[in-house]
Amino acid sequence: MSAKPIKSILFVCLGNICRSPLAEGVLRAVLTEGGEDRDFVIDSAGTGGWHAGEQPDRRSIAVAAKHGVDISGQRARKVLPEDFPRFDLILGMDEANVRDLKALAPAARDRIHLYLDFATGNVTDVPDPYYDGTEAFASVYRMIRDASEALAKRLDASPSTLDSDQASSTI
């Protein structure tokens, strides 16, 4: 088992306008609130490119802003082949995202995980709130906030390395 330094994290959902931009923004906020001074590269992308160049969904922007997190400057993009060697940790929001990512980059399988499973040990998807109302976005925000706090603690517990075997994801 070899330990890899975790210096870059990519969050991935389907369109990169709801869940993954929230995860990117919330983890940044959690690390800042915790006085985390390590330099991280945190980004987000989608497995699909339908929304490339667009801002996050207005409901994601609103729920983040309600909690003091500004994600309005983010722009959607599709996962690129060069993302796989660039990021130490790639976290999919649901099992379909994880399957798609592993199919795109089989060599990166050990760095691709289901977000909630990796962060909290809870093998659960972050549901896509796109076709739902504001309460669904609020619920997704809470899930992402809790997972981001757990992930920050996990990163802090092992400040320079994280064993890939620590994740229980078997997807």
Regions picked out by a protein language model, each given a short descriptive name:
Residues 89, 95-171:
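Phosphate-binding/catalytic loops
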Residues 20, 94-95:
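Helix N-cap/beta->alpha junction signal
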Residues 2-86, 153-163, 171:
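Conserved active-site segments centered on acidic
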Residues 13, 64, 91-92, 144:
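Hydrophobic structural packing positions in well-ordered secondary structure
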